[in-house]
């Protein structure tokens, strides 16, 4: 092979197959628990061995499993939206949000480990469905694509608020993680709105809430 053809091969643009391989690799990292956080772990409060009863520990683990599933879905959703988005600025915003959600994913996974529990057994299903939903949302156009992101974050904020109310008061480590996640979600929502995201129709918002309820109810146990 000539030098010029070698340079051409090395300098070629990534094609659809490269993108597909990249998405499969990311999905495997998310589902295997191999994803690592770029920011420090928010749970810095010391935890006494007997701080939580077995019942409280199971409840905290159920809530953190729900949060972990939410982050699995966020990864897939935003990657799906970005994969089908043709507007560079919107695509970059979606990928940036997905990258920050990796921190949440890793934090929830670590807290589940500390609580002696595990992620949802249905994570491959949640990831696949959310990625497909993200691709579909992207075809609605950039304003609604970003509006979908903003509404997702708004509903996640409300869901995290509920967890802060029901987590055991003495489970400060879980509470610190959830509080930091809530702050990040608010920033993601605001970024999507500033970038041109528009409010979604009421039926769409209602359908999103219904789907979220099914996911949270199932993930608490499985």
UniProtKB/Swiss-Prot annotation:
Origin: domain of life: Bacteria
Gene Ontology CC: plasma membrane
Membrane topology recorded in Swiss-Prot or TrEMBL: Peripheral membrane protein
Binding positions for Fe cation 1 per the UniProt entry: 71, 101, 104, 185
Cellular compartment(s): Cell membrane
Listed cofactors: Fe cation
Comment on bound cofactor: Binds 2 iron ions per subunit.
UniProt-annotated binding residues for Fe cation 2: 101, 153, 185, 188
Pfam families: COQ7
GO molecular-function terms, A-Z: 3-demethoxyubiquinol 3-hydroxylase activity; metal ion binding
UniProt catalytic activity: a 5-methoxy-2-methyl-3-(all-trans-polyprenyl)benzene-1,4-diol + AH2 + O2 = a 3-demethylubiquinol + A + H2O
GO BP term, example: ubiquinone biosynthetic process
Pathway: Cofactor biosynthesis; ubiquinone biosynthesis
UniProt similarity note: Belongs to the COQ7 family.
Entry-linked HAMAP family: COQ7
Function: Catalyzes the hydroxylation of 2-nonaprenyl-3-methyl-6-methoxy-1,4-benzoquinol during ubiquinone biosynthesis.
Protein name: 3-demethoxyubiquinol 3-hydroxylase
Source species: Bordetella pertussis (strain Tohama I / ATCC BAA-589 / NCTC 13251)
Name of the encoding gene: coq7
């Amino acid at each position: 092979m000539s030098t010029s053809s070698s340079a051409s091969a090395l300098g070629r643009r990534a094609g659809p197959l490269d993108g597909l391989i990249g998405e499969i690799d990311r999905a495997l990292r998310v589902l295997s628990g191999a994803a690592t956080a770029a920011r420090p772990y928010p749970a810095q409060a010391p935890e006494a061995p007997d701080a939580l009863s077995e019942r409280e520990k199971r409840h905290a683990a159920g809530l953190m499993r729900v949060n972990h599933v939410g982050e699995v879905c966020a990864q897939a959703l935003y990657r799906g939206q970005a994969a089908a988005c043709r507007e560079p600025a919107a695509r970059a915003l979606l990928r940036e949000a997905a990258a920050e959600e990796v921190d949440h994913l890793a934090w929830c996974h670590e807290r589940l480990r500390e609580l002696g529990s595990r992620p949802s057994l249905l994570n491959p299903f949640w990831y696949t469905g959310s990625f497909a939903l993200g691709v579909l949302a992207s075809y609605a156009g950039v304003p609604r694509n970003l509006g979908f992101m903003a509404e997702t974050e708004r509903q996640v904020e409300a869901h995290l608020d509920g967890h802060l109310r029901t987590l055991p008061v003495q489970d400060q480590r879980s509470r610190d993680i959830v509080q930091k996640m809530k702050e990040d979600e608010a920033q993601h929502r605001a970024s999507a709105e500033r970038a041109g995201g528009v409010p979604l129709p009421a039926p769409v918002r209602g359908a999103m809430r219904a789907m979220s309820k099914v996911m949270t109810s199932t993930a608490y146990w499985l």
